[in-house]
Amino acid sequence: MQQGWLSNWLVKHEVVHRSLGFDHRGIETLQIKAGDWDSIAVILYVYGYNYLRSQCAYDVAPGGSLASVYHLTRIQYGIDNPEEVCIKVFAQKDNPRIPSVFWIWRSADFQERESYDMVGISYDNHPRLKRILMPESWIGWPLRKDYITPNFYEIQDAH
């Protein structure tokens, strides 16, 4: 599989990762181990990836793992030619823990909270990791493939 310049740079510096190829826009996707994510995130920030475009999470497969996905941007040669990379960090469902990157990219705040709320990934060292969309009393993680929808009845306004 063809590797991009970032993957080659990480190999040169003996940083453990796996290239997952390129998307339709030519953006390389890298898989990083959860235990290595905080140090690799610092490396990427120092190297110029100072903008977290988006972060999301998804359930890979029933009984499988969960993924936290980060889209990072580096603007080196002008705003018309940004360099982007996609990082996927996987965690097991039985103990889904990933280091938070809030302290590197502040825009991760609400995005990691939403991923926690919907998928159940705990982001270590996040300053305000609590539900953001669902009530605090909600049980379960609504976007997991094994989620069972609770029985509830809609209360309608009489007007």
Curated annotation (Swiss-Prot):
Pfam families associated with the record: Complex1_30kDa (PF00329)
Keywords per UniProt: Chloroplast, Membrane, NAD, NADP, Plastid, Plastoquinone, Quinone, Thylakoid, Translocase, Transport
GO BP, one annotated term: photosynthesis, light reaction
Catalysed reactions, as listed in the record: a plastoquinone + NADH + (n+1) H(+)(in) = a plastoquinol + NAD(+) + n H(+)(out); a plastoquinone + NADPH + (n+1) H(+)(in) = a plastoquinol + NADP(+) + n H(+)(out)
GO cellular component: chloroplast thylakoid membrane
Cell location: Plastid, Chloroplast thylakoid membrane
Top-level class of the enzyme under EC nomenclature: translocase
One example GO MF annotation: NADH dehydrogenase (ubiquinone) activity
Topology class, membrane: Peripheral membrane protein
Domain of life: Eukaryota
EC number: 7.1.1.-
Keyword Translocase among UniProt keywords: yes
Predominant location: plastid
Keyword Amino-acid biosynthesis annotated: no
Function of the molecule: NDH shuttles electrons from NAD(P)H:plastoquinone, via FMN and iron-sulfur (Fe-S) centers, to quinones in the photosynthetic chain and possibly in a chloroplast respiratory chain. The immediate electron acceptor for the enzyme in this species is believed to be plastoquinone. Couples the redox reaction to proton translocation, and thus conserves the redox energy in a proton gradient.
Family per record: Belongs to the complex I 30 kDa subunit family.
Subunit structure comment from the entry: NDH is composed of at least 16 different subunits, 5 of which are encoded in the nucleus.
Matching HAMAP family: NDH1_NuoC
Official protein name in the record: NAD(P)H-quinone oxidoreductase subunit J, chloroplastic
